[in-house]
Amino acid sequence: MLKVVGASWQKTRIGTYILIGAGLLVIGAFFIGYMERPEYDGTYCATALWTKQVGFQIENWKQQNDLVNIPTGVGRICYKDSVYENGWAQIEVETQRTYPDWVQAYAAGMLEGSLTWRNIYNQWSNTISSSCERDESTQKFCGWLRDLLTTNYHRLKRQTEKAENDHYWHQLHLFITQLEGLETGYKRGASRARSDLEEEIPFSDFLLMNAAADIQDLKIYYENYELQNSTEHTEEPGTDQPKNFFLPSATMLTKIVQEEESPQVLQLLFGHSTAGSYSSMLRIQKRYKFHYHFSSKLRSNTVPGVDITFTGYPGILGSTDDFYTIKGRHLHAIVGGVGIKNENLQLWKTVDPKKMVPLVARVMAANRISQNRQTWASAMSRHPFTGAKQWITVDLNKMKVQDNLYNVLEGDDKHDDAPVVLNEKDRTAIQQRHDQLRDMVWIAEQLPGMMTKKDVTQGFLVPGNTSWLANGVPYFKNVLELSGVNYSEDQQLTVADEEELTSLASVDKYLRTHGFRGDLLGSQESIAYGNIDLKLFSYNARLGISDFHAFAGPVFLRFQHTQPRTLEDEGQDGGVPPAASMGDERLSVSIEDADSLAEMELITERRSVRNDMRAIAMRKIGSGPFKWSEMSPVEEGGGHEGHPDEWNFDKVSPKWAW
């Protein structure tokens, strides 16, 4: 009897414990439910690991807030896609100097490909895939282009491996290695996400995406030389005129401001607006912090340009806009470029495209190995075949406050006082200041097969002439004459423009006012092409502070409390607005083809955009932001997968973690 009672008590005690435990679990769950959970902003991070025995591995950390403490490994990456929020994605990649350069490069490519694979696919589908399948002629051109770039890739790979002790060629080798890693990472990312993509991206199309800046030049060569010599060429006699392709180009504005009271204090104002197909508007702000060396030997010095930030596109390892800021030990500089106009197609006879080096690879190599702006221009002058542009590069470290003696001399000259008597020490100090300013600003201009470069610092310090508007018209006289382009004062800044350009806000207004929107040309002429972004940069030498922000999407003006005007009202003005007068009269666009340019700008014929239509388009920039839903399928041309419908975004200033 006692045994039965004891057993029953034991069961009761166990049951009580179970009930208490269950109650505690309920209470704990209640409190956990009300605890503050970590909120993430959509930033995904990963680390690349490498050993000789195992090879490469990627550790994905999913969403993270504590970016600083992401494990370094060979390299690490953080990526946030905010295209629907502000028009930009953002990516930051860092590698470690203790690993061989080729390991750093391949790991960086793998990391980027694995996290951005979806945007890479969308960009390829919107641009290359849709453009190359448009008709028979573009299919043939794309086939020729893929064969050329693949052959060129194998040639470059062999040559860079042989010339590993050449600083420039070593960087080209690393670019190729990073691109190979990008393809591997793309495949791994898509496989890891178990994505069922409609098409595979061949490696030749990764090459093609990274040759985006060269394609317009290659198209000119193809139409005028490759196609003309082809046995399949059946064009009627008398119609084989040279084919050139002009589009509303990117615009770049550079101004160095000197304070009236302290002319020795310099400030840089810089604006850049890219021209391109609306289909290519999947944008990424990138930062590459790669600790490469001058050669493949780990004991060689680290390159000056370790830290490079730029605005770019998915799947492309450089800007192609082009705008870069470069930092490193004793280095802080910017680089900007726009396409250059060329009427002299005879220059292409001296160029062999099989020996080309893609522009984006050349620029990234120059950015990394150049300690100053002269060496940057010299590096860019190697292999100037395709990707013809005009460039400006500014050394921000040279924009420092002048010494006190120089200030006194400037003040005496200003007030017509008696000059200060100089001794040898004073003269030396002044000469050192002039030497300091030397090589602060360089301009380089490339036509097929040649490049002209020069230190133009003094030209930017002359009162009343401190700005340069780069819109494709050559800066140097010899380049202008060789290009056959007609110079026009209407394409340059006026005195009134110079006086108004005193801040980033005024640079912003100028570039928007003189922007081009092909979707506003009218119902019969609309094309999905124009100025698709705006980047603004300033540097205050006194404070040593820079400011950068970017806008995504076709440019438009934000008017407040303004009654919209009708076209009838505009017609009563009896004149062309100032904005239209700044239009380049030589620009021409093939409407039938330009609507499908995508990233590749595959144009096959010419037809001018009438001046009156351009004037209307430029006026209507104030009508509001671009919307895909307001364009017909014919006008759209390429695709727009992954794009927001309305491109109405405010400025974005990236914040970097490392």
Swiss-Prot record:
Subcellular localization: Secreted
Protein keywords: Glycoprotein, Hydrolase, Lipid degradation, Lipid metabolism, Secreted, Signal
InterPro entries in the record: PLipase_B-like
GO biological process: dorsal appendage formation; imaginal disc development; phospholipid catabolic process
Pfam families named among the record's database cross-references: Phospholip_B
E.C. code: 3.1.1.-
Signal peptide limits: 1-29
Keyword match ATP-binding: no
UniProt-recorded Gene Ontology molecular function terms: phospholipase activity
Transcription as UniProt keyword: no
One cellular component term from this protein's GO annotations in UniProt: extracellular region
Glycan attachment sites: 229, 465, 486
Tissue: Expressed in neural and glial progenitors prior to, but not after, differentiation. Not expressed in late third instar disks, but is expressed uniformly by early third instar disks, in the imaginal ring of the proventriculus and in the salivary gland.
Domain of life: Eukaryota
Family (UniProt): Belongs to the phospholipase B-like family.
Function recorded in the entry: Putative phospholipase. Involved in the regulation of cellular plasticity in imaginal disks.
Protein name in the entry: Putative phospholipase B-like lamina ancestor
Gene it is expressed from: lama
